[in-house]
Amino acid sequence: MSLDPAIAAKLKRNDAGLFSAVAQEKSTGDVLMVAWMDDEALARTLETRKGTYYSRSRQQYWVKGETSGHTQYVHEVRLDCDGDSVLLIVDQEGAACHTGTHTCFDTDVLLAAEQ
């Protein structure tokens, strides 16, 4: 798969050719996770509607839920104003975080809402 050249032209990548991808749950608005993508991962996501990312540590592509069953169905993909990040609006089946929790953002609250 290759990314549409019109989309590729809008992306700003880091030195490794990557950009960040934020997965947000459609039904709740919760931010579930942040991962990395490159052009190929984005092309696969757009083609299959499955959250597909690039692992920097393993240097390979991975489809969310491929081994765990905790899949992401992608409803929308949006490019941010700077072109260096994408937002995936998803239906999350099971845990989004590799620790087994629904979101990766449930461990440490660094600043809580004022009461």
Curated annotation (Swiss-Prot):
<dbReference type="GO" id="GO:0005737">
    <property type="term" value="C:cytoplasm"/>
</dbReference>
<dbReference type="GO" id="GO:0008270">
    <property type="term" value="F:zinc ion binding"/>
</dbReference>
<keyword id="KW-0460">Magnesium</keyword>
<dbReference type="GO" id="GO:0004635">
    <property type="term" value="F:phosphoribosyl-AMP cyclohydrolase activity"/>
</dbReference>
<keyword id="KW-0368">Histidine biosynthesis</keyword>
<dbReference type="InterPro" id="IPR026660">
    <property type="entry name" value="PRA-CH"/>
</dbReference>
<feature type="binding site">
    <location>
        <position position="97"/>
    </location>
    <ligand>
        <name>Zn(2+)</name>
    </ligand>
</feature>
<keyword id="KW-0479">Metal-binding</keyword>
<dbReference type="GO" id="GO:0000105">
    <property type="term" value="P:L-histidine biosynthetic process"/>
</dbReference>
<comment type="pathway">
    <text>Amino-acid biosynthesis; L-histidine biosynthesis; L-histidine from 5-phospho-alpha-D-ribose 1-diphosphate: step 3/9.</text>
</comment>
<keyword id="KW-0963">Cytoplasm</keyword>
<feature type="binding site">
    <location>
        <position position="82"/>
    </location>
    <ligand>
        <name>Mg(2+)</name>
    </ligand>
</feature>
<keyword id="KW-0378">Hydrolase</keyword>
<comment type="subunit">
    <text>Homodimer.</text>
</comment>
<keyword id="KW-0862">Zinc</keyword>
<feature type="binding site">
    <location>
        <position position="80"/>
    </location>
    <ligand>
        <name>Mg(2+)</name>
    </ligand>
</feature>
<dbReference type="GO" id="GO:0000287">
    <property type="term" value="F:magnesium ion binding"/>
</dbReference>
<comment type="similarity">
    <text>Belongs to the PRA-CH family.</text>
</comment>
<protein>
    <recommendedName>
        <fullName>Phosphoribosyl-AMP cyclohydrolase</fullName>
        <ecNumber>3.5.4.19</ecNumber>
    </recommendedName>
</protein>
<dbReference type="Pfam" id="PF01502">
    <property type="entry name" value="PRA-CH"/>
</dbReference>
<feature type="binding site">
    <location>
        <position position="81"/>
    </location>
    <ligand>
        <name>Zn(2+)</name>
    </ligand>
</feature>
<dbReference type="InterPro" id="IPR038019">
    <property type="entry name" value="PRib_AMP_CycHydrolase_sf"/>
</dbReference>
<feature type="binding site">
    <location>
        <position position="84"/>
    </location>
    <ligand>
        <name>Mg(2+)</name>
    </ligand>
</feature>
<keyword id="KW-0028">Amino-acid biosynthesis</keyword>
<comment type="function">
    <text>Catalyzes the hydrolysis of the adenine ring of phosphoribosyl-AMP.</text>
</comment>
<dbReference type="InterPro" id="IPR002496">
    <property type="entry name" value="PRib_AMP_CycHydrolase_dom"/>
</dbReference>
<feature type="binding site">
    <location>
        <position position="104"/>
    </location>
    <ligand>
        <name>Zn(2+)</name>
    </ligand>
</feature>
